[in-house]
């Protein structure tokens, strides 16, 4: 049987863990070849706590380099041997949220799209993934780098000589998010809970989702990867919730959801969802 190959394309260190961490751990545990390409170093991230606060952009501006170590440790927890960066580490800078001022180095969203597409298409041709995963058109919650990553990955999948059999978007399930938030009854002091309607996340309805992977067996690996991103993520002691620098509590969902953007779906369950991103592929 041919070894399955999956490629995840993400904008910043920690995105791979927050959106697809359990999926990555699941497929590495199955013996698949899993690669993660990260488009920036995440230099513009807000830093949690005081220990590494001086690394932030308005101080030493060394956060991006530090986050290479965090990403390396997180990927190791998920079973991936090393990080890969689009164009090499530091080629394009984290663009920040909408309204973030331009820095001295070219921002990811301002980069030459043709060059970026060619670099990613070349990586696809090198790695020959059976499955490629990136964000939905809104980038999950509207971050400019996530939206740009979606557009770039879509273009690269089209431009690559290697024909990617299945191309997915990682998405948030609206119903699962609401259920998870309702269950957050005991969160650490200082954290706040919001309704799903008050969050910037764009949830997908059940009838628009194509795949749901129930990955409770890999929750521990995902939580370990979250802990590795200590400048960006705080995990509750019970491991059931987490918060970013804004201290908004979010559930750790044991299921990760996907929309199939290109390719043929495999077998679906009674809910109408695939339960394996490799479903329908002939890897013999």
Swiss-Prot record:
It catalyses: 1D-myo-inositol 2-acetamido-2-deoxy-alpha-D-glucopyranoside + H2O = 1D-myo-inositol 2-amino-2-deoxy-alpha-D-glucopyranoside + acetate. It is an enzyme of class 3 (hydrolase). It holds the Pfam family PIG-L. Its cofactor is Zn(2+). GO terms for molecular function: N-acetylglucosaminylinositol deacetylase activity; zinc ion binding. It comes from the Bacteria. SUPFAM superfamilies: LmbE-like. GO terms for biological process: mycothiol biosynthetic process. Catalyzes the deacetylation of 1D-myo-inositol 2-acetamido-2-deoxy-alpha-D-glucopyranoside (GlcNAc-Ins) in the mycothiol biosynthesis pathway. This is 1D-myo-inositol 2-acetamido-2-deoxy-alpha-D-glucopyranoside deacetylase. It comes from Mycolicibacterium gilvum (strain PYR-GCK) (Mycobacterium gilvum (strain PYR-GCK)). The gene is mshB.
């Amino acid at each position: 049987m041919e070894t399955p190959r999956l490629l995840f394309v993400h904008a910043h260190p920690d995105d791979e863990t927050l959106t697809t961490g359990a999926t990555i751990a699941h497929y590495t545990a199955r013996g698949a070849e899993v690669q993660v390409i990260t488009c920036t170093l995440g230099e513009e991230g807000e830093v949690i706590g005081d220990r590494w606060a001086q690394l932030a952009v308005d101080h030493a501006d060394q956060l991006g380099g530090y986050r290479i170590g965090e990403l390396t440790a997180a990927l190791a927890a998920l079973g991936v041997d090393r990080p890969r960066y689009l164009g090499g580490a530091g080629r394009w800078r984290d663009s920040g949220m909408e309204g973030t001022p331009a820095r001295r180095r070219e921002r990811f969203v301002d980069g030459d799209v043709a060059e970026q597409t060619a670099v990613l298409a070349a990586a696809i041709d090198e790695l020959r993934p059976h499955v490629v995963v990136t964000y939905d058109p809104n980038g999950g919650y509207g971050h400019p780098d996530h939206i740009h990553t979606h557009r770039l990955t879509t273009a690269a999948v089209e431009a690559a000589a290697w024909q990617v059999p299945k191309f997915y978007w990682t998405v948030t399930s609206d119903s699962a998010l609401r259920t998870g938030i309702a269950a957050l009854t005991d969160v650490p002091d200082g954290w706040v809970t919001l309704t799903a309607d008050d969050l910037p996340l764009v949830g997908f309805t059940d009838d628009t989702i194509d795949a749901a992977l129930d990955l409770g067996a890999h929750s521990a690996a995902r939580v370990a990867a979250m802990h590795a991103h200590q400048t960006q993520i705080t995990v509750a002691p019970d491991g059931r919730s987490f918060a970013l620098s804004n201290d908004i509590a979010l559930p750790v969902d044991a299921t990760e959801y996907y929309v199939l953007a290109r390719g043929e779906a495999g077998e679906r369950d009674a809910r109408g969802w695939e339960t394996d991103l490799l479903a329908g592929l002939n890897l013999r």
